[in-house]
């Protein structure tokens, strides 16, 4: 099985319109094989802002990252691999595009 990546695109309530426009752009431009989640207008799990998620095979990472860099504007993005150690996935194995946000790491175990 190939490595799967999760990408979380965060937004503040006042950025919801921009986030929805970005979501629509990504829906039209993401490569085949990507899963694009709906906008979640509240904090969920370890995430400290509203967000939406994109899941994809590691082979698509360059294409997805390029699209996000081109279109994300001021929105922070967390990219991380799916792995058994959720804490490591969201910290040492993760990287940020834009501002690095705090996460509720205690919800991830270790």
What is the meaning of each model-derived region?
Residues 1-110:
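Long, contiguous binding/interaction regions
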């Amino acid at each position: 099985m190939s490595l799967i990546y999760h990408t979380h695109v965060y937004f503040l309530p006042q950025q919801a319109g921009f986030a929805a426009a970005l979501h629509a752009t990504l829906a039209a431009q993401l490569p085949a094989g990507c899963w694009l989640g709906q906008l979640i207008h509240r904090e969920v799990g370890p995430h400290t802002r509203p967000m939406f998620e994109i899941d994809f095979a590691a082979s698509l990472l360059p294409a997805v990252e390029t699209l996000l860099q081109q279109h994300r504007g001021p929105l922070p993005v967390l990219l991380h691999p799916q792995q058994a150690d959720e804490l490591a996935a969201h910290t040492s194995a993760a990287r940020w595009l834009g501002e690095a946000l705090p996460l509720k790491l205690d919800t991830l175990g270790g």
